[in-house]
Amino acid sequence: MVSKKSRTEVRVKKHNRMRNHLAGTAQRPRLAVFRSNNHMYAQIIDDTVGNTLVSASTLDKDIKAELEKTNNVDAAAKLGTVIAKKALDKGISTVVFDRGGFIYAGKVKALAEAAREAGLDF
């Protein structure tokens, strides 16, 4: 009997394949996105050293206070603008976008477009 793999297993497998080709450097770090059922998380990572340079999530008090819900497209767009502003304050203007195996639609797309509008290049 052939068993069907879960969505999470398929997503993790896609992410591992992508990570073989994506790597963040000091000049162009990686913007990694993670989406759970209730929240979204974004980190800007320098993979050569293994350090997180900037991070933000919908759990942050200043972001959460402005939102009705933390798991919709509006929350993702707000997170994109916040992560872009934090990155620009640290002197990071270009990044490599790592969608984490998630489909580039909905919340992930909203976060990416908001980050681009706020000044990040990718």
From Swiss-Prot:
GO terms for cellular component: cytoplasm; ribonucleoprotein complex; ribosome. GO terms for molecular function: 5S rRNA binding; structural constituent of ribosome. GO terms for biological process: translation. Keywords: Ribonucleoprotein, Ribosomal protein, RNA-binding, rRNA-binding. It comes from the Bacteria. Part of the 50S ribosomal subunit; part of the 5S rRNA/L5/L18/L25 subcomplex. Contacts the 5S and 23S rRNAs. PANTHER family: 39S RIBOSOMAL PROTEIN L18, MITOCHONDRIAL, LARGE RIBOSOMAL SUBUNIT PROTEIN UL18M. Belongs to the universal ribosomal protein uL18 family. This is Large ribosomal subunit protein uL18. It comes from Agathobacter rectalis (strain ATCC 33656 / DSM 3377 / JCM 17463 / KCTC 5835 / VPI 0990).
